[in-house]
Amino acid sequence: VKAVGAITLQRILLADDEPDILEISRIALETVGGFEVSVCSSGKKLLERLVEFEPDLVIVDVLMPDMTGPEVFEEIRRRPEFDAIPVIYLTGVIQEEELEGLRDTGVADVILKPFDPMTLADRVNRVWEGNHGR
C-alpha cells in the first residue's frame, strides 16, 4: 500500500505483450512504489481482469497484437464503474506528432520505451496526485 497524502493507491493493472517489460515493471512498482500489481499479456485479458482486480490505475502498452492501448482505453471509458480510473500508455513511438496524438486521447500520461523502470513509480505517483488535485 502506497500512501499519497490522504489518498491510498494500492492496485495497478498492467498490460504489455513483452514479458520482460511486464516483469521489470511489476518488480519496480511493487518494490519501489509499494503497489499491488497484476500483470497480463493482452488488452483483452486486461479488460477481463478489471472487474475482479478493481485497479486504482491502469498501465497499457499502445501496440499489442489483440487490442491497441487506445482501444483498451476507450473500452474502459465506456464502463461507468471504471471511467474515472487513470490510464497510462507505454509506447515505443518516437515521432512527435504520434506522441501528441496519444496524449490528446485523454490518458493521464504517456511513457516512452525504453524507460528506466525505477522512474515508473514516480510517474505513477505524479499521475495519481494530479488526478486528486495535489
Task: For each feature predicted by the language model, list its residue ranges.
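Receiver (REC) domain active-site loop signature in two-component systems and cognate sites
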Residues: 64
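Acidic, metal-coordinating helix/loop segments flanking the phosphotransfer/catalytic sites
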Residues: 39-57
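C-terminal output helix
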Residues: 115-124
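Two-component/phosphorelay signaling modules centered on CheY-like receiver
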Residues: 19-38
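Short, glycine/charged-rich "phosphate-handling" switch motifs in NTP-dependent
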Residues: 108
